[in-house]
């Protein structure tokens, strides 16, 4: 099933995370690699960024330090992570612990590609961005489109 949470704070603009310190939230299909019950932001779930696609595109572009340590966490502020508030983070943390992190697929996208076209790619974006958005759209396709809003979708398999 899919469970969606409102994102209260995230930094950056539409487009993928490219390097450490760029303040971007990754876009793509990820898993959860670690649960942190002692986060400064209440509780946190670590996103497995960079994934294989991110690493391949980093090699292709000659980028070495892609960054990492991307979290979904409580509170209402963030730089490069996804803040969903304490209550939602706690609920998600428990769901992830009970489901098992190996059974979670996290889709992070600038829009819901089942209802909206991908954002236009300009000259400042990587040439592989359409390929990324095709992969993200394919990950969303099997699931019914939910209501609109700035939301984080987690797919529990």
Listing of model-derived features with the role each one plays in the protein:
Residues 21-157:
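Exported/periplasmic cell-wall-interacting domains
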